[in-house]
């Protein structure tokens, strides 16, 4: 399980940096866990270089140095240093079970499915394995003869799976008669804070987008005993907000400088994030916390991003090797669609009834102010595994 959580978190940071290249000044919100789980279903049916490339991008490769090797050596290393597939899939099965069995205080709804053109039938063994490890059932559909009808059916299924929170995942031109295989992944998260904000303390305040521009936001406020941590380079402060039952928590990384987010994003690595957010770096303080209310709904067509990260063969009709999935040649991944929804408010990540539990600490604690009034990074983390379920950047109200 440690290997999988590390893989997901490494993928989260690499993927976020790639997204940031074309999203300057924009909010980012995605689920590295969701993307990894959905792509792992595809990876289950790949072979050869297609499998090696996917393993590298998803951080399933045990030897990350291979990315710096010459092409011939890189291919050899990638093929022989991948973690055992059965171990990876078994860990996904365990992680999915862990997350879904989390306390009633948090609800995570996912819509995760592969849709393949019906003239490219799936192997029976592949269908069985996807159901065993991921609890999902790939669908054979008529892209050739009824592509738009299939698009509407996919959107309807996603909407139902996410309790109406994720609408129109696939836009009008998302599929056509040439589509061979589409992967959809949508997530909706709802949680209740351990310590809730009082609605009457929420007031309008300025959020500094940069040193010269501000926008008004509804700023929530609380004074509570919370865990904080400090980052020396680049200078930043972090804070952990638990959800009820403490299975999950929100981690916020706030640069000291209003314009410091770019430097923080460039500096962050898996090793540094693990160190910054480890239990022994946390300090319990009396915190005056100011945090904006916000709602993010982001949709990503992942084909270009994933291709640029190194898994181009899967999207190439002449190079893709999905022989573990189907006997038909020329099967390739046409697109990957991902959409996430989150709302941060006084009660939690979506308005819901709930009462916060009080932790009594009979000692004098340092008092600090944590004022999230300028761009910051945030993560929703599964605490038992330390896996990042959601990754976000809030910089534009």
UniProtKB/Swiss-Prot annotation:
CDD domains attached to this UniProt entry: serpinB10_bomapin
Any single GO CC term annotated in Swiss-Prot or TrEMBL for this entry: nucleus
Annotated site (Reactive bond): 362-363
Pfam families reported for this sequence: Serpin
Statement: the UniProt record of this protein carries the keyword Nucleus: yes
InterPro entries recorded: Serpin_CS, Serpin_dom, Serpin_fam, Serpin_sf, Serpin_sf_1, Serpin_sf_2
Gene: SERPINB10
Keyword rRNA processing in annotation: no
SMART domains: SERPIN
Intracellular or extracellular location(s): Nucleus; Cytoplasm
Residue ranges of coiled coil: none
Positions of disulphide bridges: none
Name listed for the protein in its UniProt record: Serpin B10
Location of the motif Nuclear localization signal: 74-77
Record keywords, A-Z: Cytoplasm, Nucleus, Protease inhibitor, Serine protease inhibitor
UniProt GO molecular function: serine-type endopeptidase inhibitor activity
Similarity field: Belongs to the serpin family. Ov-serpin subfamily.
Taxonomy, superkingdom: Eukaryota
Organism: Bos taurus (Bovine)
Role of this protein: Protease inhibitor that may play a role in the regulation of protease activities during hematopoiesis and apoptosis induced by TNF. May regulate protease activities in the cytoplasm and in the nucleus.
